[in-house]
Amino acid sequence: MSKEIPTPYMWSYQPQMGLAAGASQDYSSRMNWLSAGPHMIGRVNGIRATRNQILLEQAALTSTPRSQLNPPNWPAAQVYQENPAPTTVLLPRDAEAEVQMTNSGAQLAGGSRHVRFRGRSSPYSPGPIKRLIIRGRGIQLNDEVVSSLTGLRPDGVFQLGGAGRSSFTPRQAYLTLQSSSSQPRSGGIGTLQFVEEFVPSVYFNPFSGAPGLYPDDFIPNYDAVSESVDGYD
C-alpha cells in the first residue's frame, strides 16, 4: 500500500460534552489487494486517492476555520443556534374559581373598574364591579349578562376581532409558550454540526515529522475531556 495515500482518521462524537472524542484510522475501509497484480494495485490506489481528495474538499466547504483542531469550548458565534418549537400546555377551566375571582375584583390585565353609566356624560365614577356596559379597557370573568351582548362566553373564553362560536371546550383552554433561550448557546456542538465540522481527516505522512507535531487527537487513547493522553505525562 502506498504511504503517500493515507487512510483517513474517523472522528468519534462525545454527546455529553458536545465535543469530538478523538480520531482513529478506519482500517475497515482498506481493500484486500495482497494477491493483486500491479494493475489492480494501481486502480485501488486511484480509488483511495480520489476518496481522500473528496474528503479534503468537503472539509474545506463545511468546516469552520479555527486555530485548534478540536476546541474544548465553542464560542456562541460558531455554534448552530436552534429555535425550538413552541410548547402548548393544556389548562383546565375552573368556572367556580373564576366566579370567586370576579366577585373579589379580579380582572384581565389592563382592566379598569371605573364604568360609565348609561346616558351620563360626566366623568367616570366608581361603582360595582359588574355592569351591563363594557368600555373596552377590561372584561370581567364569568359575567353571564354581558356575554350575550359582547360575544363573550360565560366561562371566560373569548376571541379577538370577532365574536364567533368558539371551538374550545368550555372546561379547557390552551396556553402556548415560546421556548427560546435568553442568551445564545455556547460550549458544545450538536450532531448535525459535528458531522459538518469533523469530516474524516486526511493526514499526510503522519510519522515523518517530529513526535511533538503529531496531533494528540489522532492518538487512540486521547481523552477529549481532560485534553490529555492516558499513560503520558
Swiss-Prot record:
Q: In the record, what terms sit under GO molecular function?
A: hexon binding
Phosphoserine modification sites? S180
PTM sites of type Phosphothreonine = T64
Q: Which InterPro entries match?
A: Adeno_PVIII
Site, as annotated: Cleavage: G111, S112, A163, G164
Q: Name one GO cellular component term.
A: host cell nucleus
Q: Induction of this protein: by what?
A: Expressed in the late phase of the viral replicative cycle.
Point out the propeptide residues: 112-163
In its record, the post-translational modification comment is: Cleaved by the viral protease during virion maturation. May cause the middle segment to be shed from the capsid.
Keywords for this entry?
Capsid protein, Host nucleus, Late protein, Phosphoprotein, Virion
Describe the protein's quaternary organization and the partners it interacts with.
Interacts with the peripentonal hexons as well as the hexons in the facets. Part of a complex composed of the core-capsid bridging protein, the endosome lysis protein VI and the hexon-linking protein VIII; these interactions bridge the virus core to the capsid.
Q: Which family does it belong to?
A: Belongs to the adenoviridae hexon-linking protein family.
What protein name applies here?
Pre-hexon-linking protein VIII
Traced from the root, the source organism's taxonomic lineage reads:
Viruses, Varidnaviria, Bamfordvirae, Preplasmiviricota, Tectiliviricetes
